[in-house]
Amino acid sequence: MAPAASGAKKQKKKWSKGKVKDKAQHAVILDKSTSDKLYKDVQSYRLVTVATLVDRLKINGSLARRCLKDLEEKGQIKQVVGHSKMKIYTRAIGADE
């Protein structure tokens, strides 16, 4: 019984307060400057996903998905992986087609 009692004297772990992440204020509507940046810069990206557009252009996820669909219809990007949760695109190169 003595060894069990000595184990209880261990100091309790103090919990940290945790970090609070600021809420992102990303654009919900595609304005002219963001649209120009999208069409110009996306040709240099090797990997294009919703997350890359959200991170680089500061737009929200639903807008990024619509942009990807539009870029694919215009032939600027092509789909590499189509999954129910994530679609991965790459830049379309004329020699591939």
Swiss-Prot record:
Region described as Disordered: 1-24
Compositional bias annotation for Basic residues: 9-18
Pfam family, one: Ribosomal_S25
Source species, domain of life: Eukaryota
Keywords, comma-separated and alphabetical: Cytoplasm, Ribonucleoprotein, Ribosomal protein
InterPro entries for the chain: Ribosomal_eS25, WH_DNA-bd_sf
Gene Ontology cellular-component annotations: cytosolic small ribosomal subunit
Molecular function in Gene Ontology: structural constituent of ribosome
Matching SUPFAM superfamilies: Winged helix' DNA-binding domain (SSF46785)
Localization, UniProt: Cytoplasm
Subunit note: Component of the small ribosomal subunit (SSU). Mature N.crassa ribosomes consist of a small (40S) and a large (60S) subunit. The 40S small subunit contains 1 molecule of ribosomal RNA (18S rRNA) and at least 32 different proteins. The large 60S subunit contains 3 rRNA molecules (26S, 5.8S and 5S rRNA) and at least 42 different proteins.
Family of this protein: Belongs to the eukaryotic ribosomal protein eS25 family.
Function: Component of the ribosome, a large ribonucleoprotein complex responsible for the synthesis of proteins in the cell. The small ribosomal subunit (SSU) binds messenger RNAs (mRNAs) and translates the encoded message by selecting cognate aminoacyl-transfer RNA (tRNA) molecules. The large subunit (LSU) contains the ribosomal catalytic site termed the peptidyl transferase center (PTC), which catalyzes the formation of peptide bonds, thereby polymerizing the amino acids delivered by tRNAs into a polypeptide chain.
Record's protein name: Small ribosomal subunit protein eS25
